[in-house]
Amino acid sequence: MIEHMMTLYSLHRFLTSTACVLCLSLGMLVPAAAQNNKPSANNDAKCPAVLQYTVDRLQDEKPQNLCQYTGQVVLVVNTASFCGFTPQYKSLEELYARYKDKGLVVLGFPSNDFSQEPGNNQKIADFCENTYGVKFPMFSKTTVRGADASPLFKQLTQLTDTAPKWNFYKYLISRDGKQVKSYNSTTDPLDSKFLAELDKQLSAKTP
């Protein structure tokens, strides 16, 4: 009887130890699976350096990685609500609606660097939607020139040797992110020369 009980006890210890080993093994596998959900190094490598920034969206201030626009032609514009060039919002929206299916995205960055965007993000978002029906992506109010400029605008300035001189300055980034051209505030987004350059960039193959 005692030998039978000892046998059962030994069997119980063996099964318990085996179960613990299995649990530990499975526990070690979970983090590895979780890591696979992160963006791979290969995907990151495709994103051009000029887009490797995370910025807050205007409407809800949630972070957004600009790498999601990899392979598109990107037009970056610093905007303001009380500027003589503010009606360019209409042209920018028309441009976006006309070319977004061909690979263009317009990114708007409100700024008070020239003292013509005093409102907070919510007021700016309401103005853009209610006045011009803006649908292209807009981001939180930011600094676009000088020592306090955002990293994105610092790089755009470095790549073109031109910082925004006024509101509605424009930077056109090629699909592969290797070419960046700047356009001053007086260049309307629907200007024929600008559209010619845009068509050229859109016709380039996606990297």
Task: Name every feature range the model reports, one short phrase each.
Residues 70-75:
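Local sequence-structure signature of Cys/Sec-based thiol-disulfide redox active-site neighborhoods
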Residues 30-33:
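Sec/Tat signal peptide C-region and signal peptidase I cleavage site
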Residues 85-149:
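Structural microenvironment flanking redox-active thiols in thiol-disulfide oxidoreductases
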Residues 1-12:
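N-terminal secretory signal peptides that target proteins for export/translocation
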Residues 78-82:
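Amphipathic alpha-helical repeat scaffolds
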